[in-house]
Amino acid sequence: MRAYLQLMCKRFRTAVVSAVLLWAGAAGALPKPHVVAFGKWTSAKWYVGPAEGKPLELKVRALFVDTRLKEYTTGVPHDVTDRLFVVRRVFRLNDTLPSESTLAPRWVWERGGWLLVDRVTGRVTQITLPEFDPFYSTGSWYRDYVAYCGVSDDGKKLFAVVAQLGRRKPILKRVLGGPDGDDLPDSECPAPAWQRQPTRVTFQPDETQKITFGVRGHAVDIVNDTEEDEEGGE
């Protein structure tokens, strides 16, 4: 009887230890929650113009994931979902010449494209936007769409572009004409204006040109003046 009790106690202890180990393993397999946060705003100088001699104030703040610096950002983030958001990227570029003998790099601020941030996984990725020019293009977000005026690689064409997250090609790319080639940022056209019900976006690169597109899923159609007048009279 005594031997039987000892055997049962031993089996019980083994079962308890096994259960604890299984629980610990399962707990370790669970994904750890990530903390995504922004730092404080700071002012930086962004030099523009033909000789890059005109300083503009650039509001910058750091993006941290689990207290680790990931990127520098500017502007207000846009929440795509309760999990994903996008924000404009800025970065520091080494402006030191090969002939300059200095131990410390000469850093200058530059504006980049857009970042996609996942609050759950903590992943930060750069978004590839066709014809997006970091100097001239101003992105206007609505849901998972972004509208902007893009510039061709040779600088001779200005495009109305609508892109959607998760799609490699834009759902809209239409030539608006030629860029003015101004030396100031965001000077080619203002941020496009969105509206809902129905979903539409309006581009107005100058006072003489205004064009509206209707967006339905992955399809985009131009909206003529007659349609706008009819809806305005309802």
Residue ranges and their predicted role:
Residues A3-V16:
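Bacterial N-terminal signal peptides that target proteins for export
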Residues V17-L22:
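Hydrophobic alpha-helical targeting segments used for export or membrane insertion
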Residues A24-A26:
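N-terminal signal peptide c-region/cleavage motif recognized by signal peptidases
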Residues G28-E234:
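Exposed acidic/polar residues on beta-strands and adjacent loops within beta-sheet cores, strongest
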